[in-house]
């Protein structure tokens, strides 16, 4: 990838095609840029904008410190959750300056009952392993902060514009709080638009669902109609990606998000194939790509974002019982070896070993249940 700090990013996707990502493309895809236009077809959402500079700094700093529960009266979590860092005092100082911001978040939670947070572009899906609900569902202010602080996706949002010429003067970070919906991942679809033509639709979740086969043509027809009625001529870019959700009874399409038409956007179809699809060609036939049954136990058969949640050995082991057992045995052998090296301290170390193995098991189970 070629990174031009003054303007754009470019990626060569095949021998003849280069895609360009501009700052304007990114800005057009941030939530507040499009939500008002599509509000009637998007789940209920509240946007807190602009975010206080102290809150942005709080998200940017390493470590996790949450507001004192007794001070905020938000939720039943312990008052402070910490991961020690050299900048802990500075991080704590940011938290202490957010007393006026906490009630704004709480007000939206009170309105909706539960919320799913995101920043301008990204949702902290990679951090749900740390959530008690194993999802992005938040019922307290601390739930929201913990997810945002634990997410690599959110950290990326905070620096994304720096690689494209910097942050515009009129730009501000925003906290998006969507009313919580218990989404069935099988019913989420990603739609690719090139030159204002819908060129491909794919399943978003990387697992096989047999029931989707019978519904494929119905979903494709509904998505195509939705595109022509609401999206085709209204989004500012001519090429882009949008996500939809079609819950039971499958009679309404909900717009969930917009993404750039660029390889940084995940796709089940190779980008070298996507850029060569031509909806104006007489031979073109729009298709909805579903995960094939044969791929169910292959590389696609995993939960989205699992690589971001816990170490890869745990992710891999969670998909294979024998691998899980072997991983835990290996850890036990290593701990036993360390016990032997420490001599008289072996007994104390042995107590810790049990906790360590139990924690690894819990982490693996969390990964395997990702939604």
UniProtKB/Swiss-Prot annotation:
List UniProt keywords, sorted A-Z: Cell cycle, Cell division, Cytoplasm
Q: Its principal location?
A: cytoplasm
Localization per record: Cytoplasm
Domain of life where this protein originates:
Eukaryota
In the UniProt record, which is one GO cellular component term?
A: cytoplasm
Renumbered to this chain, the Polar residues biased-composition regions fall at 349-371
User: One biological-process term from Gene Ontology?
Assistant: cell division
Q: Which GO terms describe its molecular function?
A: ATP binding; magnesium ion binding; protein folding chaperone
User: Segment Disordered: which positions?
Assistant: 334-371
Q: Which PANTHER family match?
A: CELL DIVISION CYCLE PROTEIN 123 HOMOLOG, D123 PROTEIN
- Summarize the protein's role: Regulates the cell cycle in a nutrient dependent manner.
The family annotation for this protein states: Belongs to the CDC123 family.
The name this protein carries in UniProt is Cell division cycle protein 123
Q: Which organism is it from?
A: Yarrowia lipolytica (strain CLIB 122 / E 150)
